[in-house]
UniProtKB/Swiss-Prot annotation:
This is Interferon tau-2. GO terms for cellular component: extracellular space. It comes from Ovis aries (Sheep). GO terms for molecular function: cytokine activity; cytokine receptor binding; hormone activity. The lineage of its organism: Eukaryota, Metazoa, Chordata, Craniata, Vertebrata. The gene is IFNT2. It is found in: Secreted. PROSITE patterns: INTERFERON_A_B_D. GO terms for biological process: defense response to virus; female pregnancy. Residues 1-23 form the signal peptide.
Amino acid sequence: MAFVLSLLMALVLVSYGPGGSLGCYLSQRLMLDARENLKLLDRMNRLSPHSCLQDRKDFGLPQEMVEGDQLQKDQAFPVLYEMLQQSFNLFYTEHSSAAWDTTLLEQLCTGLQQQLDHLDTCRGQVMGEEDSELGNMDPIVTVKKYFQGIYDYLQEKGYSDCAWEIVRVEMMRALTVSTTLQKRLTKMGGDLNSP
């Protein structure tokens, strides 16, 4: 039994190490986590979106940037990572925990963290020394501005139930776009180490 466990550990270490690329493939697990997160967001619905129509806002989701051909492969990974990180940050707040069912919120945050952890296995290899420059990359700045608009909206609306419902619907759109980006990356080869 100990031998089998040791062998499995060795295989995992080799596949995720610098020589192996298993850790940098966009796996089915990542896509399953994304779908599960969307289902959780849907289940978090507490109000009818129709009752909050007066609070609607266009947050300027950079959908065309992600779904179009504007992003190159070397930009797509950092944008995907930033979208997931910002989504996690949004839901991992005191204001958020006051607005949602705690169990569903914890499951959503765990799912987002799992996606980020999976991407973290590749992040250093994909972004390397360019990491500091990528923070200033236009698509990343666009994503940050988009999420800042969401934070500003919530604050302006006093973190009301309707404001959170509008944001929940918006985050379903954003996570759908990030899933589309994951699919694009997979079609680009899936191996995030390849140029």
